[in-house]
UniProtKB/Swiss-Prot annotation:
Signal peptide boundaries: none
Pfam families listed in its UniProt record: ABC_tran
Protein name (Swiss-Prot/TrEMBL): Lipoprotein-releasing system ATP-binding protein LolD
Domain ABC transporter: 7-227
Organism: Rhizobium etli (strain ATCC 51251 / DSM 11541 / JCM 21823 / NBRC 15573 / CFN 42)
Primary role: Part of the ABC transporter complex LolCDE involved in the translocation of mature outer membrane-directed lipoproteins, from the inner membrane to the periplasmic chaperone, LolA. Responsible for the formation of the LolA-lipoprotein complex in an ATP-dependent manner.
């Protein structure tokens, strides 16, 4: 495999239900994502967009096919090993920021680093650098409720990359923001991806933002296709 390929899906199948109620969402889906690449996933609700992200992020097991991350096949691994890969290699950003309300912005970004075994000092330094990079270093001591929507989402992005993953999966990361704020947040996300060499798959309904990414894909009849 090309060493620059971070994520590769080969013939991925995903079903829900059984018997007469069996619903096939992904039907032999193929997709690859390279280091430093930002790809937009633009698809109507109900076509399998979130399912694709969940399978790619090792949150769900595919019913067929193969998921490979940085050259390592993830199918057949124990849940413990899948969790370890997820924590080490993958960052997630969602439409709702899911920040812990009782902790400051800085502490929210520190949390995954502390869980990963970094010292308090190391986590604090890294979190501060990320806040500065996202241009909200002055807001580090504020709790989520004291931040604007755009600031909250930038904290969520910083938290997602706190452990220096190689793959970023984002599900409608600007969906709750007004167009101007959405553009500003995407600018910050794009700069972070380019600077760090992350591979990013971003699900969005925002066609303007999708047009600024390297490629656009959709899901048609259970397969991933470019458009």
């Amino acid at each position: 495999m090309n060493r620059n390929v971070v994520l590769k899906l080969t013939g991925v199948e995903r079903h829900y239900g059984q018997g007469d109620t069996l619903l096939t969402i992904l039907k032999g889906a193929d997709f690859s994502l390279a280091k430093g690449e930002i790809v937009a996933l633009v698809a109507p609700s109900g076509t399998g967009k979130s399912t694709l992200l969940h399978v790619a992020g090792l949150l769900e097991h595919p019913d067929g096919g193969e998921v490979t991350i940085n050259g390592h096949a993830c199918d057949g691994l124990s849940d413990e090993k899948r969790t370890a890969i997820r924590r080490r290699e993958i960052g997630f950003v969602y439409q709702f920021h899911h920040l812990l309300p009782e902790f400051s912005a800085l502490e929210n970004i520190m949390m995954p680093q502390l869980i990963a075994g970094l010292s308090w000092k190391e986590a604090q330094e890294r979190a501060g650098q990320l806040l500065d990079y996202m241009r909200i270093g002055h807001r580090g001591s504020h709790r989520p409720a004291e931040l604007s929507g755009g600031e909250q989402q930038r904290v969520a992005i910083a938290r997602a990359v706190a452990n220096a993953p190689t793959l970023l999966l984002a599900d409608e990361p600007t969906g709750n923001l007004d167009p101007e704020t959405a553009s500003y947040v995407f600018d910050a996300l794009e700069a972070l991806v380019r600077q760090s060499g992350l591979a990013a798959l971003i699900a969005t309904h925002n066609h303007e933002l999708a047009g600024r990414m390297d490629r656009r894909v959709t899901i048609s009849d259970g397969k991933v296709v470019e458009f």
